[in-house]
Amino acid sequence: MTDERQRPPVTVEARRKAVDQTLTQLARTMEQLETAVTFFSPDFDLEAYSAAWYSKAPEKRNRAMLVRSNMDDLYNLCQTLIDRGVRLAQDLGAIPADRKTPPSDQLRNEDLYPDEVEQLMRQAAYLRNWSQHQYWTLAPDQVHEVVNAARACLPPFIAAIGAWVWGFEREGE
């Protein structure tokens, strides 16, 4: 038996709100990541991070895991921002309403998905999957590398997507 009911279409205003909420959560999570890495001063020191990662003290290991957890959250939120931003752009007519082309490819077509962000997202997905399925083999240097790349390239990427979304919204109103 199939259900004949369909979900009502999502309004542009609801999509705008979802994008705004995602941007807010990204800012908060980036702040959390920056706070988490301060436990490994100076400037997210790999030696200090590795020592905490392998420590017998649970509070030190928790600090190391907090960095990894925030990185996972950033990856998931960036994927959400990409998906929501592209969908909003389609709804507003800023880009073609193409549901078959992956949102990341559509951002690339708009020159909004730089190679370094694409590479980071691949690395972060790999790290996230590895941490969920083979966590006992994950090493601190792998997390350290991805986190440093994220700290360097995600803030300008997130800002560019935010500016893009709010820019075409004003044009479409």
What kind of feature is each model-predicted range?
Residues 2-173:
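Solvent-exposed interaction patches of small proteins and small membrane subunits
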